[in-house]
């Protein structure tokens, strides 16, 4: 039993070690960013200092981009390893299977509605029209009621069309029954 635990811990430990290395790279990235800002904010008095500062900024920027690249590559590798091991147990040497998780879809229409409301509000601010907040709410309620009425009318029309179609089918089947009776 302890051999199985050791093999289980190997795969898990490898993943943890890899994520730790990525975490260290992120810390290094943040350190490089802070040193870049420090170099940028330090005033230089002579032209020699300015060229030195430019060289430092180039080197630090290069370090930042290298760190970002290394972090992105490391995360992609980890995601790939995780994806390969979801739902199967024979993809890694330790026979570990990662169970799939279900991710529920969030309500994305709410964000769109809020965005549209914000855009309307910004348009009123930009155009300089003063509108009362209660007036906007009343207009919004009226628009919502109109949309609801339109939806109800559409559903009523669909119901009527369905009823008509059913009645037509009944009539045609009754006519077929009469024709069958006449033949018999």
UniProtKB/Swiss-Prot annotation:
Predominant cellular place of this UniProt entry's protein: nucleus
Molecular function GO labels: transcription coregulator activity
Region span, Disordered: 142-184
Domain of life: Eukaryota
Coiled coil: none
Biased amino acid composition, Polar residues: 142-152
Record field: compositional bias (Acidic residues): 174-184
Subcellular location: Nucleus
Record GO biological process: regulation of transcription by RNA polymerase II
Pfam families to which the protein is assigned, alphabetical: Med11
Keywords, comma-separated and alphabetical: Activator, Nucleus, Transcription, Transcription regulation
Keyword Transcription attached: yes
GO cellular component, one term: mediator complex
Gene3D superfamilies: 1.10.287.3490
Biased composition (Basic and acidic residues): 154-173
Subunit structure: Component of the Mediator complex.
Function: Component of the Mediator complex, a coactivator involved in the regulated transcription of nearly all RNA polymerase II-dependent genes. Mediator functions as a bridge to convey information from gene-specific regulatory proteins to the basal RNA polymerase II transcription machinery. Mediator is recruited to promoters by direct interactions with regulatory proteins and serves as a scaffold for the assembly of a functional pre-initiation complex with RNA polymerase II and the general transcription factors.
Family that this chain belongs to: Belongs to the Mediator complex subunit 11 family.
Name of the protein in question: Mediator of RNA polymerase II transcription subunit 11
